[in-house]
């Protein structure tokens, strides 16, 4: 079961065919050859993290290995996409390392795990998944044809979204699924912020406003909408909240909050949040408490209006008049 507030350590012993790469949250401490020719991969014990963030990926993958400030960085894909990986590797790693440096400065703490692998896998039923130290992506982001600028920007956003989860989601995890927004809202906001501030894709917020925000406007006017922070009774129910409200609307609302508080208070609040909750779990109240302490004002009223209430602000007008002349008019919000 995936109860995010139950964290555990993991120790793996994996027997695999010779020549296979075996990837998990940390690097295997030892790889030995068994009498039958297979390989035994012995992993040391991991740090504590939630069960839904555990991964084991194994296969005859192609690998590109680099490092950033002594942190191992790996890129993996199936052999038939070797050329596509080679063509994309420099840009993928450039965006990754730019994001790592940006987040380390913003959060007041460096990348928290011992290595960072990115695996581009086939037949993956999600765009990407933030497994600790071993993020999986659908391999369609390794472009088969020359990519457009827009395709590269969106790929960069996905890379930085998953990287942000190493702090928001993996290092500090929601206590229960009703705080899914703490993971996805912030990863979306942070990915566009870092994309615009730290990479070549300086127009990222224009893309967000033109392509992402309208999806949230549309969904928020449906009877099926929900608040950003919403009650979830069981794990299956949480699946329905991976949508434009949690991602795009949430990111827009956090951007508004940062503008209201000021960037200095926002940074200070993030530092407090991670100092208090690193390697543990947190709730809406925990996060708002850290930001409110940094800003010197409570955020409960703001939360009720923007995080805990569904639908969007609408403006209507009524008027009265005769003979083609408006004699009175009222605006309603």
Model-derived features with residue positions:
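Hydrophobic alpha-helical and helix-loop surface patches within well-folded domains
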Residues: 43, 74-332
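Extended, low-hydrophobicity, Ser/Thr/Pro/Gly-biased non-transmembrane segments
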Residues: 1-61, 65
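A generic structural signal for alpha->beta connector loops
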Residues: 19, 70-72, 115
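Extracellular/periplasmic catalytic domains that process cell-envelope and extracellular macromolecules
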Residues: 5-6, 34-35, 67, 110-112, ...
